[in-house]
Amino acid sequence: SPEDIVGMQVSQGILTVRGGMTSHAAVVARGMGTCCVSGCGNDNDVKIDEEAKTFELNGHKFVEGDWISIDGSTGNIYGEQVATVAATGNKNFNRFMGWADAARQLLVMTNADNPRDAQQAVDLGAEGIGLCRTEHMFFAEDRIKAVREMICARTVEEREAALAKVEPFQQGDFEAMYRIMGERPMTIRYLDPPLHEFLPSKDEDIKELAADMGMTFDDLKNVVASLHEFNPMMGHRGCRLAVTYPEIAAMQTRAVIKAALNVSAETGYIITPHIMIPLVGEVKELKFVKDVVVKVADELIKASGVDMKYLVGTMIEIPRAALTAGEIAKEAEFFSFGTNDLTQMTFGFSRDDAAKF
């Protein structure tokens, strides 16, 4: 949820009861560079009292202000402040990787969702960004309200007005990232998670948001309820959102193309935006969203008078997409593999629960 992301961003470490090494919390924390131990027990082992701000673990009670130390490599938890040593470079490792660099032919890229991540990626030698998850940009405090207005919109006009508030933020982030990446490739994935993830679930949080947005509690509660899904991972998300609300894809395309044009004019970099449409299951879905992207992008590029190239591809993360990849390839200009969802849907495992058995 948005509250989880904001909390994770300001945390020095993350400890969760549920999940495992491959759960969403662990993956996001790893991307943030934040120490995380995910899945430290079950509800019987760990008792959390949010109101009192305490938790019990293996018979030990911790209150707000107490120190604990966690080791993200081993999963160990220490009930005290443990002295730490800053990580240092390994000469033997660096030497070995130098040999690998001399022999390899593949580019080694990274995930980065904001300018800070992009700068760190370049500093550590990344040759591009293989995945920029645009929804993480939506969670920032200065733009989440506009995103929520878009979700609660009742008409296309209301939705477009809210998206117009989000667009400058997205464009600004993309411009900053393009300046950092230079001519290195950057693949930008369009909005992927279901919309309910941007709204609160607790009544007290819904009341607070309703007052902030000028809505009644009941109206906002109904919006939240209407977005509820029994299995959101397989629900209204990814390209399905763009099919239902093409104005979202249009806004994101404007932000990407304008950012690339501006930075290219400013720096002289030859930038080729890579636009990724997520969760495609068959070629008709990709073509529908691609047509929206191409129309908006071509109009902006023509108006600029610059001959800028761009690519539109997709992520293969549904078994049906893998089976019909030959058809999808007729429309896609590149593929990326989303191994998290593809593995879960192929084997019927949940990455949040598989570690238990």
Give the ranges of each region predicted by the language model.
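Acidic, glycine-rich flexible loop/linker segments
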Residues: 1-132, 136-150
